[in-house]
């Protein structure tokens, strides 16, 4: 492992600290911890609770030391980013890889997956640096060669290459000035076309089936593949779990791609509970087939635990809690890409670059997953005269998402889709009914 840099957040800026200051900081933290651990005695339970809350202040300063394998330490050499930011990107890619694919038998494929994630991370907050339409050379990587290093010899090689290029195309547009163009406008409108289309587009946006395929490849399980219906259910579980937990993170980002920006918010807890239960049932049904544990492991870790284990999230900064509503400070830090987050603020700009859009549609077999071009053409101008569509997308205010605002009638149809999830899951995976009493 390679230690890269130790940094601390002071006034929303990263600075490098010396070992001596690091030691001083640890001593200070120890002193604070001792004072916080003193018992609070008060006969009035309300006063006691208030005192306990006051004794646990928000973490204002947190130090991180980034670790990652030497295999990726010299990547991004020619890319104009600060060294400390590169260190954070490498560590984020390593932590994500270890969380969502905890087991591996093929190190070379594993490293290729890390590099895929490095490219994806940069696309998410520095979209102007990534243009998959212009070149196969991205950020110093040969994209096709990296995808081949991960998937060559697997049944999903070509399909997953298109999946990842779609992710890069849309994600980089969203995180750059290109989001004011025709492609991203039509893309966000199409997200709200139907719940099934939404989950397929969110699947790609989250690299969900892509990571399932990567987990199989990194464990040399080249003989396993899923049907389209099976991929849809597996990724719907993962995306629903993740988006339920990341609800406030996504609002802080003004996100267009979050399940509960469209699904009724009051179903968030119920949806999480049902998806978690089905995941445990599927895990038990597949228990005698250890090869499939790689699939379950991804969905399980992606669906929640990464929010505690990865330093990309605010679990430590928010006193070991998950699910805190975003504050103005969090939103402001998101604009500054703290923790590699990215804020999509609304603006009045709209670029009618239909020529670029048409050129991309013509290249859809290379740059879009199967079916996306049809989604964009059919739903790109909106399909409901009551939903609120815009010329350019992003959050207009704090505590808002950045996408289409569904009307009450459309929300009702989306509610019905989510409420029949268990029935849909058991139809695709009948072993759920064979082995367990799953209510339908």
Swiss-Prot record:
<dbReference type="GO" id="GO:0016829">
    <property type="term" value="F:lyase activity"/>
</dbReference>
<keyword id="KW-0843">Virulence</keyword>
<keyword id="KW-0456">Lyase</keyword>
<comment type="pathway">
    <text>Hormone biosynthesis.</text>
</comment>
<comment type="function">
    <text>Alpha-ionylideneethane synthase; part of the gene cluster that mediates the biosynthesis of abscisic acid (ABA), a phytohormone that acts antagonistically toward salicylic acid (SA), jasmonic acid (JA) and ethylene (ETH) signaling, to impede plant defense responses. The first step of the pathway catalyzes the reaction from farnesyl diphosphate to alpha-ionylideneethane performed by the alpha-ionylideneethane synthase aba3 via a three-step reaction mechanism involving 2 neutral intermediates, beta-farnesene and allofarnesene.</text>
</comment>
<dbReference type="GO" id="GO:0009688">
    <property type="term" value="P:abscisic acid biosynthetic process"/>
</dbReference>
<comment type="similarity">
    <text>Belongs to the alpha-ionylideneethane synthase family.</text>
</comment>
<protein>
    <recommendedName>
        <fullName>Alpha-ionylideneethane synthase aba3</fullName>
        <ecNumber>4.2.3.-</ecNumber>
    </recommendedName>
</protein>
């Amino acid at each position: 492992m390679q230690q890269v840099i130790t940094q601390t957040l002071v006034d929303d800026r990263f600075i490098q600290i010396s070992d001596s200051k690091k030691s001083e900081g640890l001593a200070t933290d120890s002193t604070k911890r001792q004072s916080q651990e003193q018992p609070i005695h008060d006969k009035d339970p309300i006063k006691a609770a208030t005192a306990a809350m006051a004794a646990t202040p928000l973490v204002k300063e947190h130090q991180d030391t980034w670790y990652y394998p030497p295999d990726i330490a010299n990547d991004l050499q020619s890319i104009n980013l600060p060294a400390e930011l590169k260190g954070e990107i490498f560590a984020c890619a390593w932590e994500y890889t270890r969380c969502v694919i905890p087991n591996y038998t093929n190190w070379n494929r594993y490293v290729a997956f890390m590099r895929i994630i490095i490219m994806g991370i940069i696309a998410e907050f520095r979209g102007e640096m990534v243009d998959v339409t212009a070149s196969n050379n991205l950020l110093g990587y040969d994209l096709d060669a990296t995808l081949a290093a991960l998937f060559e010899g697997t049944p999903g090689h070509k399909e997953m290459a298109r999946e990842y290029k779609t992710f890069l195309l849309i994600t980089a547009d969203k995180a750059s000035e290109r989001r004011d163009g025709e492609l991203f406008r039509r893309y966000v409108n199409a997200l709200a076309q139907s719940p099934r289309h939404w989950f397929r587009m969110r699947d790609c946006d989250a690299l969900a089936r892509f990571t399932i395929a990567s987990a199989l490849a990194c464990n040399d399980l080249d003989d396993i593949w899923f049907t389209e219906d099976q991929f849809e259910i597996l990724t719907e579980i993962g995306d629903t779990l993740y988006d339920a937990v990341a609800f406030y993170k996504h609002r802080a980002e003004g996100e267009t791609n979050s399940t509960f920006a469209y699904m009724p918010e009051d179903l968030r807890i119920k949806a999480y509970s049902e998806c978690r239960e089905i995941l445990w049932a599927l895990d038990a049904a597949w228990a005698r087939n250890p090869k499939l544990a790689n699939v379950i492991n991804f969905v399980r870790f992606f669906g929640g635990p990464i929010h505690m284990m990865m330093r990309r999230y605010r679990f430590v900064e928010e006193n070991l809690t998950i699910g805190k509503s975003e504050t103005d400070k969090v939103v402001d830090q998101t604009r500054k890409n703290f923790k590699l987050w990215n804020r999509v603020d609304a603006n009045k700009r709209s670029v009618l670059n239909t020529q670029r859009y048409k050129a991309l549609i013509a290249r859809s077999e290379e740059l879009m997953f199967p079916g996306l071009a049809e989604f964009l053409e059919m739903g790109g101008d909106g399909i409901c005269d009551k939903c609120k569509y815009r010329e350019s997308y992003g959050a207009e205010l704090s505590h808002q998402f950045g996408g289409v605002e569904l009307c009450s009638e459309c929300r009702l149809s989306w509610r019905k889709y989510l409420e029949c999830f268990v029935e849909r899951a058991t139809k695709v995976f009948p072993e759920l009914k064979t082995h367990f009493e799953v209510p339908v």
